[in-house]
Regions:
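Bacterial Sec-dependent N-terminal signal peptides
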Residues: 1-24
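Terminal presequence/propeptide segments associated with secretion/organelle targeting
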Residues: 18-313
Length: 313
């Protein structure tokens, strides 16, 4: 999947009580029923429909696409949302000034009136996902060129999207290619545009260790920020207005103070950027024998140039 494809996936890190080996894998929530028996055997206490359901409230209704590339989760019945500090960094920066340096000092709204609006920021709730492979490839023949295939996929996808967003207010849809174009899914979202900053720690906490620590484990970063989603009086999406009220989620996460124990079942629900877990063998061969060697050569050349100029300065 390309980086621009922000597709909701359940990444399973299931820990059996007798071992510490992670089962791993990335799974579409709509297909999680194929894994539920194994998950329950490892300690999961819910059903597949508790994770993903289009008819009843489920965990999917508490997990949101924050902006266009981050994951957030609802943690209160009044629209309070938790996401990463780096995901809210742009909004924190926009509200900062010389007098109020929220990046340096942090920010906490002491009342609803102090929460800060963020023009252009949206939060998207997944309504449903649907396999539309047959509809997307309708009219395609194996004898056609790649350019013809791309055109057919684009036109069919647009028609599917246009039809899907007619279903209600505030809907946004995408058609995404999975498994390198072998399968296509429609993702239908309900998008809320009134999202207000509630709180964030100082960058010395929220960005502690920077990008270096971002790729390390364990981490010691307070990488979080808090926002609140607002809606109109009928709980529907609406542009920013002082008349809007906190969104009432179908589902939200209750935060436990009990902590976790070794062997507890764990899984991650969110919007990862991309995965190459299912890349084919020739793709791996290309990375190993062609892509990476060229990258190493280019970066070595750049470092040589930098080092030469540094030694002369």
């Amino acid at each position: 999947m390309k980086n621009r494809f922000r597709i909701i996936l359940a990444g399973l890190l299931a820990f059996a009580c007798m071992t510490s080996k992670a089962d791993e894998g990335m799974w579409l929530p709509s297909l999680i029923s194929q894994r539920i028996t194994d998950m329950q055997a490892k300690g999961f206490r819910l059903n597949a429909e508790d994770i993903y359901s289009i008819n009843e409230a489920s965990l999917k209704d508490a997990v949101v696409l924050f902006g266009r590339g981050c994951t957030g989760e609802l943690v209160s019945p009044e629209g309070l949302l938790l996401t990463n500090h780096h995901c809210g960094y742009g909004q924190i920066q926009k509200h900062s000034s010389v007098e109020h340096d929220y990046l340096k000092d942090g920010f906490w709204a002491m009342s609803r009136a102090e929460e800060l609006p963020n023009k252009g920021l949206t939060v998207s709730f997944l309504e449903r996902m649907e396999d539309v492979t047959d509809a997307v490839l309708n009219g395609y023949e194996p004898s056609m060129s790649e350019e013809q295939r791309v055109e057919i996929v684009k036109n069919n996808s647009k028609a599917i999207i246009d039809e899907a967003v007619k279903e209600g207010k505030g809907l946004r849809a995408t058609v995404e290619a999975l498994y390198y174009g072998n399968q296509y899914f429609l993702f239908l979202y309900r998008e809320y545009a009134d999202v207000r900053l509630v709180g964030a720690p100082p960058s010395s906490i929220g960005k502690f260790g920077g990008d270096t620590d971002n790729w390390m484990w364990p981490r010691h970063t307070g990488d979080f920020s808090m926002f609140r989603v607002y809606a109109d009086k009928d709980n529907n999406p609406a542009e920013y207005s002082e008349d809007n009220v906190p969104y009432r989620p179908k589902k939200y996460f209750r935060i436990s103070t009990k902590g976790v124990q070794e062997g507890d079942f764990t899984f991650i629900y969110g919007f990862p950027g991309r995965t190459q877990e299912y890349i084919h063998s020739e793709g791996v061969r290309y990375i190993e024998e062609t892509g990476d060697p060229h990258k190493i050569a280019l970066r070595t050349l750049r470092l040589d140039i930098m080092n030469r100029h540094q030694s002369q300065s």
